[in-house]
Amino acid sequence: MTHRPRIAVLLDENTSVDGTRYDMTKNYFRAIASAGGLPFGIPYHSEIIDITVSDFDGLLAVGGRFAYPDDWFISAQSSKAPASERLPIERALMQGYLQRQKPILGICAGMQMLACLHGCRMTPDLRAAYPDALEHDKRGQYHRVDVAPGSTLARAIGASSLSVNSFHREAVVELSDQVVASGRAEDGIIEAIEIPSHPFAIGVQWHQEAFALEDHPGNSIFKAFVEASRQA
């Protein structure tokens, strides 16, 4: 019987109701299960960070809306999102997986944290900073992402481009020398990143989990992530 890797999925919370409940789509779990993994929701308890890092094969860092540190943004800008206890837990988990060279897949906010932990910088308001850019914060809108040849993302999806959804206000706009952009929107905005020094640490800005029940080429990202976790 094929080993099904255990994937830690840090839960998101509804920051609009004072952080009193976890709140996220089931599609993250469906996507991991469909790709052959066993997803487990991880709550915000510091006592289980070490256990999660040691006992789970891969980390899925999901989307969400919460405040990042000011030094993660380009000069004189700061987060417009509410504070959340998710930040220190996710940061510790991700740092643990990075240190152990275990697979990480970041989606939306998860991609942004992966980038900023490696020295990248963001803007809290993409439309204000880049008025000529596409409307990236419009639900129901789709745009093309061009994929960098030879990247982990390109190998995963087997294509040079794909059509994705787009609903994010914040965006990674400055890369460090530790990170490469493996996907960009038609307007040049960074839509996917990778950490070359890590066996499998990639992030996508769009919400691939929204396609979990569809025949979408991007779902191969989950398959590649689960396979990397199986081999970790």
Features from the language model and the residues they span:
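N-terminal beta1-alpha1 cap of cysteine-dependent amidohydrolase-like domains
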Residues: 1-105, 123, 127-141, 146-156, ...
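Short, catalytically relevant binding-site loops at active-site mouths
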Residues: 111-113, 132, 171
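Active-site-proximal beta-strand elements of phosphoester/diester hydrolases
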Residues: 201-205
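A glycine-rich beta-turn/hairpin centered on an aromatic-Pro dipeptide
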Residues: 165-169, 176
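Active-site glycine-centered loops adjacent to acidic/histidine catalytic or metal-binding residues
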Residues: 108, 168, 207
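Gly/Ala-rich beta-loop-alpha elbow adjacent to hydrolase catalytic centers
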Residues: 106, 110, 115, 119
